[in-house]
Amino acid sequence: NWEVIREEAMHLFDEGYIRAAEKNNDAGFGSFFKKGWKRFYLKWYDKPLPSAEALCPKTVELVSAIPNVKGAMFALLPGGSHLNPHRDPFAGSLRYHLGLSTPNSDACRIFVDGQEYAWRDGEDVMFDETYVHWVKNETEITRVILFCDIERPLSSRLMTRINRWVSAQLGRATAPQNLDDERVGGINQAYAWSKRFSDSFSGVVKQWKRRHPQLYRILRPVLAVVVLVVLWKWLFG
């Protein structure tokens, strides 16, 4: 079925649907967009996105038929780009990649805990994203893959239930969008607001920091605690 998935992915690519978050409302991958990384969400922890059901129904049907697939997207990385070392702090899932349109070259690869894997069309890999990993595309060709979060197998039913509950809460709070009329989770809304606030006041804050460095060091952690409390009440209160 990978050719069917690739056909729908490349149609979205050609039409410009695989793109960065235009409103800075994707907290999980905000730093990736600076590197030219782009995505189109298929499913995010509770159900498929309406835009995905309309634009790539065959892939959505395939992904939805596998209960352990919690999140799925098409992910793009342009030639000559890279993603810095990072890791997922929540160990509730494993990461799955299926090569769709790749350079088919060892120069386009991912490093997971020091081990290399180069993507190839039609070939897949699964890894533990809690290990530090990073990506290099040292070719001139854009890489497009199917990117999935797979529920992590755990040793007991209790741990599995806890994992599913936590994943469901995080999934709702981080709900993404492909199109403007789709719902955005609270964490992503807060991230977008913080980006707008930061962009608006960064110059003023930098000037104030230079003039009052000691007071800035005192107030910064206090402000961070206040923001966390407000965010917690907004999301869970």
Task: Give residue ranges: language-model regions.
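Short coil/turn motifs at secondary-structure junctions
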Residues: 103, 134, 151-155
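C-terminal, beta-strand-rich globular interaction domains
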Residues: 128-129, 150, 160-163
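Conserved metal-binding segment of the jelly-roll/cupin
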Residues: 118-132
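A short hydrophobic beta-strand segment most commonly corresponding to one strand
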Residues: 95-98, 126, 141-156
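A short beta-strand-loop-beta hairpin characteristic of the jelly-roll/cupin
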Residues: 100-121
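Fe(II)/2-oxoglutarate oxygenase catalytic core
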Residues: 1-87, 93, 105-108, 144, ...
